[in-house]
Amino acid sequence: MSKQTPDKLCAIEDDANPILEKVRACDVLILASPVYFSRLSGTMACFIDRTRCFTFGKNGHLALKGKVGVALAVGWCRNLGMETTLASLHGAFLVHEMLTPPCHAAGALYGVGVVSGQRDENFIYKRDKLGAKDDQEGLYSVKLLVQEAVRVAKKLTNER
């Protein structure tokens, strides 16, 4: 972090730097992860680790403070790690002092989980790898939560 400059958030030269610049510029940050072994994916964990430049960097210090964060998870089953994945994403937002608005209408206090493992009439899982598109409740909850996040971000922008 000591080598950070206004134009260079991270000393590691890779394709994350342009993404980190977009994260710094956003008003609403939506992080979505698949659920693997009752937790967020390793790729998402690595990405979150790279955002430490916004908390501990000399030029990016608290760059995400006051921005709005939305946590989403996609899992095969409704209750096999959705909550822990959402909690990890939510925790990252809190470390950055971001706002994570709940949406009671969506039943979303920490984010939204969408189920990809849909069952047939015999309660047997279908083999559809795009089953998340059939989770109407989950997708509608995502829509409501994102609308709430945008509403909060607009309100914050108007107050500045």
Which residues are covered by each model-predicted region?
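Helix-loop-strand module that forms the ligand-binding subsite of alpha/beta enzymes
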Residues: 5-109
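Glycine-rich phosphate/pyrophosphate-binding loop and the adjoining helix
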Residues: 94, 99-160
